[in-house]
Amino acid sequence: MRALAVIYAALLYGFIFLPVVVLILYSFQATSFPIPPFTGPSLRWYGAVISDGRLTAGLVNSVMVALASSAASVLLGFLAAWGFARFRLPGEAWLRALITVPLTVSYLIIGMGLLVMFNAIGMPKSLWAAGIGHVVINLPLCFAIVYSQMGDHQMIIERAARDLGAAEWQVVLLITAPMLWPALFAAFFLSMTFSWDEFVISWLLTRFDTTLPVEIWNLMRSGLNPKTNAVGALVFGVSILLAILFELVALRRRPA
């Protein structure tokens, strides 16, 4: 039975990571075609990526959009979760459901709706528009994560802080937020991950300044290009580093 479990785990992880391994392997291809046989290793295409102005600009744009939209999503999600947890609102179950609806809607539908709305109000395609779109898709996730961690014990501590003379903004900023730090960090990390490689909304809402996934798409439209493998390997490496950072922070905050 143990051997079957090991075989099953090996097949599962192989199925998940084999495409990534192949992508990383052929990112070191020396020739101009990312197909067998493998000839290398060579850093030729990594150098080509670094020297490609559009790819590096797309990378910077992706980082800026991911950071800004994730921060906004966490802030708005935290405030919404705090409001629902501390106040009784008419029809609050329906209101909570409405906040989480975007989690079940296709990004294509959300992107098209935002595109129509922005055209109606005269807002041009830009990184700002893409950032707003990323907030729309990430805010429900942040809200769900933070709201699930709010409990009665926090209300008791908040009430004690008010009894000691703390203002409401001090209670929220100095009491509630620190207690929810693990949830806030997890929400920010997941939001960053989703925003980092999101393509559909970025493609619909940007024009001249685009994000890295859109630039990769534009690169692939002209045919097979080893630079796409190098970019994919770099993006995967960044994602792994973020995951390791998240685990290290979680381990440091975990009680002994």
Residue map of PLM features:
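C-terminal transmembrane helix and the adjacent membrane-cytosol boundary/short C-terminal tail
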Residues: 1-8, 91, 147-162, 166-175, ...
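Membrane-interfacial helix termini and adjacent extracytoplasmic/periplasmic loops
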Residues: 34-38, 43, 91-92, 108-138, ...
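N-terminal, non-cleaved signal-anchor transmembrane helix
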Residues: 1-53, 57-60, 64, 250-256
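Hydrophobic positions within alpha-helical transmembrane segments of bacterial inner-membrane proteins
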Residues: 20, 66-82, 108, 112, ...
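Transmembrane alpha-helix signature in integral membrane proteins
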Residues: 28, 53-86
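Transmembrane alpha-helices
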Residues: 8, 13-20, 135-136, 142-147, ...
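Cytoplasmic-entry segments and transmembrane alpha-helices of multi-pass inner-membrane transporters
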Residues: 2-13, 79-114, 158
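Interhelical loop and adjacent transmembrane-helix boundary motif
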Residues: 31, 46-54, 196-245
